[in-house]
Amino acid sequence: MSEKPVIFFDSGIGGLTVLKEARILIPELQFVYVADDAGFPYGAWEEDVLKGRILKVFTNLLKLYTPALCVIACNTASTLMISDLRQEFPHIPFVGTVPAIKSAAAQTKSGLISVLATPGTVKRAYTHELISSFANQCHVELVGSKKLATFAENYLRGYPIDYEELRHEILPCFVEKNGKYTDVIVLACTHYPFLISLFHKQALWSVNWIDPAKAIARHTRSLLLETMKNKSSKKNIKNYALFTSQNIDFVTERLLQRFNLNIMKGVDFGV
């Protein structure tokens, strides 16, 4: 591949929320979307085992591609090992996806913030450091869901989901404290924005849901300005999607077509 693509990585299809925004801002670049669906969901993995897995995926991936930049479009992976990836592959810029706690603290009026994430992101030291640095004057409720990422995968593919279960998963985000109510909820998993219309319907009261996808896309673009200087707008750029399981059903294939992604099979990720 002659192009230096921008690689987007996630455990599943959640990172498509970020890819979609990036392609709006930088359509002239080539994108490769990599989903470690064989390891999905990441939220319940033991940290050391998951670290080893992600490192192995990238070691094999970067034998195939020399990317202009890699976006870790996964909060669980980013909070776990964005520093490790930067250290292991110092010649490649990495952009992480971390809970938008700083933005939430700036927006809240009640001082009550909730972070809706996976169990892995909730327990991560990185997440707690963000709270200490940017929201130490707020009450921050950390809510780790084991089910929502899977709900999002199913919903996006057109499969039915249990709305009562979904409601049960988000209820802990709605906190009343001393007559004040949660007014900002951070979507700290890239899968969750796919469920935003359902969240609105199941919410106990109106809140501001923060989806960081646009901010990540803007940051990605800012780092690629030099790369884009010599690029002309091409109409026939081919963007690709790779899945570690190699098992892509018809529904997933049709979904990827909506995102203008061509499926590439036969890549050995070593996992």
Swiss-Prot record:
Q: Which UniProt keywords apply?
A: Cell shape, Cell wall biogenesis/degradation, Isomerase, Peptidoglycan synthesis
Q: Read off the Pfam families from this record.
A: Asp_Glu_race
Against Gene3D superfamilies, the record matches this protein to: 3.40.50.1860
The chemistry this enzyme catalyses reads: L-glutamate = D-glutamate
Residues the record lists as binding substrate: 10-11, 42-43, 75-76, 190-191
Where are the catalytic residues? 74, 189
- Does the entry feature the keyword Cell wall biogenesis/degradation, yes or no? yes
Gene Ontology molecular function: glutamate racemase activity
**Pathway given in the UniProt record:** Cell wall biogenesis; peptidoglycan biosynthesis
The GO biological-process annotations, alphabetized, read as: cell wall organization; peptidoglycan biosynthetic process; regulation of cell shape
Q: What is its EC number?
A: 5.1.1.3
| Family (UniProt) | Belongs to the aspartate/glutamate racemases family.
Give the protein's biological function: Provides the (R)-glutamate required for cell wall biosynthesis.
By what name is this protein known?
Answer: Glutamate racemase
Q: State the organism named in the record.
A: Bartonella bacilliformis (strain ATCC 35685 / KC583 / Herrer 020/F12,63)
